[in-house]
């Protein structure tokens, strides 16, 4: 792993969280979809890898999950410890998790896998600390989406300092299946869909729009994908 590259990523996130705070991220409501997809229970022990300021952990904590988070950014860790005081928040590298084997029922990584310097090592670590019948949920960026194509390939706005990257649907499937995961379900990112359907009157939305839905376009064109996974050996 390139230490210099890792330090640049840490510095970028420290500056971003220090100056933008929670405004850098989607709102808390957007994280409700991950709670539903995982079907979280109060008995679950949850690890949020690259937890940021703790938006997902806050929701998990409210249903009495045992919550743990880790992030490389000191600014993010300070925010998370203040925002979710009931969670156990660690400063550390997601590619070398400081937790015992078989520790967690649920492992999530929301919008961060594509930023890891050593993706395979990060995935191996998440498998190591997860229990035998654990659930995994990852939000990852799609390199085939129209937005990515315009911003990154045409306008060249890719944030290389923050190690911003993406993969196609087939590439992500290959990454997960070749690194010890079974893919249970794949959904499009729910937040853009939630914003669109929010204009539909509530009484209609409640009857016609499912809480977790498959979008209006073929999955491969989604801006981001949500993967629900398990270990390959379970």
Question: Model segments located where?
Answer:
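Conserved class I S-adenosyl-L-methionine
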Residues: 1-40, 43-52, 55, 135-159
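Class I SAM-dependent methyltransferase SAM/SAH-binding core
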Residues: 53-96
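A conserved beta-strand element that flanks and buttresses the S-adenosyl-L-methionine
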Residues: 108
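A short glycine-rich, Lys/Arg-flanked "PGG" loop and its adjoining helix->strand segment in the class I
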Residues: 120-132
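A C-terminal cap/extension of S-adenosyl-L-methionine-dependent methyltransferases
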Residues: 151-153, 184-234
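Acceptor-substrate binding/catalytic loop of class I
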Residues: 154-171
């Amino acid at each position: 792993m390139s230490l210099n590259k890792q330090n640049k990523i840490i510095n970028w996130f420290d500056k971003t969280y220090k100056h933008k705070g929670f405004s850098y991220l989607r709102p808390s409501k957007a994280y409700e979809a991950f709670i539903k997809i995982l079907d979280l229970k109060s008995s679950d022990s949850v690890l949020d890898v690259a937890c940021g300021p703790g938006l997902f952990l806050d929701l998990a904590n409210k249903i009495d999950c045992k919550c743990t988070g880790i992030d490389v950014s000191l600014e993010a860790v300070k925010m998370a410890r203040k925002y979710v005081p009931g969670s156990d928040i660690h400063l550390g590298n997601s590619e070398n998790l400081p937790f015992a084997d078989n520790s967690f029922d649920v492992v999530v990584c929301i919008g961060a896998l594509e930023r890891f310097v050593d993706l395979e090592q990060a995935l191996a670590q998440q498998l190591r600390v997860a229990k035998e019948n654990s659930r995994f949920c990852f939000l990852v960026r799609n390199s085939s989406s129209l937005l990515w194509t315009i911003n990154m390939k045409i306008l060249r706005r890719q944030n290389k300092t923050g190690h911003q990257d993406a993969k196609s649907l087939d590439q992500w499937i290959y990454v997960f299946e070749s690194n010890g995961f079974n893919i249970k379900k794949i959904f499009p990112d729910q937040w853009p869909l939630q914003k669109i359907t929010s204009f539909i009157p509530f009484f209609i939305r409640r009857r016609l729009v499912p809480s977790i839905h498959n979008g209006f376009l073929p999955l491969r064109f989604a801006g981001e994908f949500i993967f629900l996974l398990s270990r390959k050996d379970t």
